[in-house]
């Protein structure tokens, strides 16, 4: 069978106009009426031209013909197709060549012909615009970079241009409808892709087989290994020389004068002396003592004793810190934090001393006024803010107490109740008691408390009782407060004056328990009588 494009004498990518012109020209030439001398041959040729134009003028027929052109030319689609392509399996053995020379049976000549045939088959399946150059296999003397490497780089990624349409099982022209045609095309496409994949893998495996036995590749690999070994040897030699050079420099190295510790210590001492002279820290005597060498006692015991004395001299009890040098101790004593800690320590000591001196005086007052005994709470260390608050609260309490005492003393009338007079006389007649403070207890009590103490009852009698309670409370004049010392019987206008007197004279002594109990019981009896 002759190719339709060859019958019309056009290229495979010819347009419709070119096909029409070629057909008219050949039809006039081979028409039987114009070839009476050779009518049989002209009729046969005219049939081929007519059939070719009929197929190529129809777009669908032309597309199908392009896809199945190779199969049609080699026997058709009826199963009579014979694949005349090169059998590559024959070249996977070492018996296909003899030696690695350049003769006809040599390794390079045999495989050079094989790849030229494969390239020729691929060019037949390509269009004129898609033609590409296939690198040659070369010979035994070919250069690796210009011939061998490009050849293997191309053929190791080989991809055939054949469509393998002769492998199709279904003729889409015989489909009854378009759905059946699509199903046929889908199955045919799977078959073609499978055949194309097998062809590509076969060629790539052949390339790998040849490359493994190619002497040019082996020589190049050996050359690369030698070059790498030479590079490693040179690198090791350079590293060894560098190490020897560094060792030699280390032997010749000398310490610079500015790096020695002796000069550094001397410069440090000079710097300290300059700063002390400028800012006034330290004295000249201390500088001389620090610069002079210390000729201490010999022996370990003398050194330990010296260190202990130095540690005691350089210890700050206020801040609970120890220092290594006298300069550091002096600088610390000049610091603001040290001065604050010293002032705080003095303040704490003064407060503790005052509290210790006033403990027994407070106990005497509490025992005289009530039966309960107050226990002293342990002293806690307070912060600055807490101490300031405590001092302010104590000062306010004393001021309020003085004001209340003087005001009440001014308001109390000179009239005294019988119970208060008895209490005062009894306290004055006690020689064993040191301190006794007699005040009008009933005058200080609130009239509301007296009114509350009256039992509730209904009727006119309760009203008379309430009036009788309110009347003496309102009409009772306020008496003066009697504050006297039980030892010397001196009277004072306020408690602060009495406390100052007790501190100065030392008359504060604890009263006997029986006397305090008798005074309390007698006061209770007098209250009951007054009710």
Curated annotation (Swiss-Prot):
Recorded GO molecular functions are: nucleic acid binding; zinc ion binding
Gene3D superfamilies per UniProt: Classic Zinc Finger (3.30.160.60), DnaJ domain (1.10.287.110)
Phosphoserine PTM sites in chain numbering: 283, 302, 370, 512
UniProt lists compositionally biased (Polar residues) regions at: 394-404, 432-441
Bias (Acidic residues) ranges: 281-290
Keywords on record = Chaperone, Cytoplasm, Metal-binding, Nucleus, Phosphoprotein, Repeat, Zinc, Zinc-finger
Q: Where is the composition biased (Basic and acidic residues)?
A: 291-302, 408-431
Q: Which residues form the J domain?
A: 3-69
Which sequence ranges does the entry mark as zinc finger (C2H2-type)? 314-338, 483-507
CDD domains attached to this UniProt entry: DnaJ (cd06257)
Q: Give start-end positions of Basic residues composition bias.
A: 381-392, 455-464, 522-531
What superkingdom heads the lineage?
Eukaryota
Q: In terms of one coarse class, where is the protein primarily found? A: cytoplasm
List the record's Gene Ontology CC terms alphabetically.
Answer: cytosol; nucleolus
Entries under Pfam families matching the protein: DnaJ (PF00226), zf-C2H2_jaz (PF12171), ZUO1-like_ZHD (PF21884)
Q: Where is this region: Disordered?
A: 278-309, 327-480, 507-531
Question: What compartments host this protein?
Answer: Cytoplasm; Nucleus; Nucleus, Nucleolus
| The protein's role, per its UniProt record | May act as a co-chaperone for HSP70. May play a role in ribosomal RNA (rRNA) biogenesis, possibly in the maturation of the 60S subunit. Binds the precursor 45S rRNA.
Assembly description: Interacts with HSPA8, PA2G4 and ZNF622.
Q: What name goes with this protein?
A: DnaJ homolog subfamily C member 21
Q: Which organism is it from?
A: Mus musculus (Mouse)
- Gene encoding it? Dnajc21
């Amino acid at each position: 069978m002759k190719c339709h494009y060859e019958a019309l004498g056009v290229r495979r990518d010819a347009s419709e106009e070119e096909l029409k012109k070629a057909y008219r020209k050949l039809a006039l030439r081979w028409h039987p009426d114009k070839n009476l001398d050779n009518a049989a041959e002209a009729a046969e040729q005219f049939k081929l031209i007519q059939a070719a134009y009929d197929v190529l003028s129809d777009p669908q027929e032309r597309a199908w013909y392009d896809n199945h052109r190779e199969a049609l030319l080699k026997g058709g689609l009826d199963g009579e197709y014979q694949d005349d392509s090169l059998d590559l399996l024959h070249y996977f053995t070492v018996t296909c060549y003899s030696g690695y020379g350049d003769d006809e049976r040599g390794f390079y000549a045999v495989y050079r012909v094989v790849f030229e045939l494969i390239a020729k088959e691929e060019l037949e399946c390509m269009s004129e615009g898609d033609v590409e150059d296939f690198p040659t296999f070369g010979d035994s003397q070919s250069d690796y970079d210009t011939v061998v490497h490009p050849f293997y780089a191309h053929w190791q990624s080989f991809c055939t241009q054949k469509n393998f349409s002769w492998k199709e099982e279904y003729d889409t022209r015989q489909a009854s409808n378009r759905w059946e045609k699509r199903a046929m095309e889908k199955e045919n496409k799977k078959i073609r892709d499978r055949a194309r994949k097998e062809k590509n893998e076969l060629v790539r495996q052949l390339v790998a087989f040849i490359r493994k036995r190619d002497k040019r590749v082996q020589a190049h690999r050996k050359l690369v290994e030698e070059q790498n070994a030479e590079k490693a040897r040179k690198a090791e030699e350079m590293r060894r020389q560098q190490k020897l050079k560094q060792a030699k420099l280390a032997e010749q190295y000398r310490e610079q004068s500015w790096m020695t510790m002796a000069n550094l210590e001397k410069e440090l001492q000079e710097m300290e002396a300059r700063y002390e002279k400028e800012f006034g820290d330290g004295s000249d005597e201390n500088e001389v003592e620090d610069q002079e060498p210390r000729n201490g006692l010999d022996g370990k015991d003398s050194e330990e004793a010296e260190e202990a004395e130095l540690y005691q001299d350089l210890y700050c009890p206020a801040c609970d810190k120890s220092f290594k040098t006298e300069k550091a101790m002096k600088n610390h004593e000049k610091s603001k934090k040290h001065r604050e800690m010293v002032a705080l320590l003095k303040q704490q000591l003064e407060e503790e001393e005052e509290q210790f001196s006033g403990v027994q005086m407070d106990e005497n007052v509490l025992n005289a006024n009530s039966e309960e005994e107050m226990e002293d709470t342990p002293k806690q260390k307070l912060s600055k803010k807490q101490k300031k608050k405590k001092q302010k609260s104590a000062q306010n309490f004393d001021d309020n107490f003085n004001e209340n005492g003087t005001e009440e003393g001014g308001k109390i009338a000179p009239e005294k109740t019988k119970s208060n007079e008895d209490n005062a006389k009894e306290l004055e007649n006690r020689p064993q008691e040191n301190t006794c403070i007699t005040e009008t207890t009933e005058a200080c009590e609130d009239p509301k408390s007296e009114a509350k103490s009256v039992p509730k009852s209904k009727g006119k009698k309760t009203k008379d009782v309430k009036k009788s309670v309110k009347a003496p409370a309102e009409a009772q004049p306020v008496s003066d407060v009697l504050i006297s010392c039980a030892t010397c019987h001196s009277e004072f206008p306020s408690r602060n004056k009495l406390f100052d007197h007790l501190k100065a004279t030392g008359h504060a002594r604890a009263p006997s328990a029986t006397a305090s109990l008798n005074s309390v019981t007698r006061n209770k009896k007098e209250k009951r009588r007054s009710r």
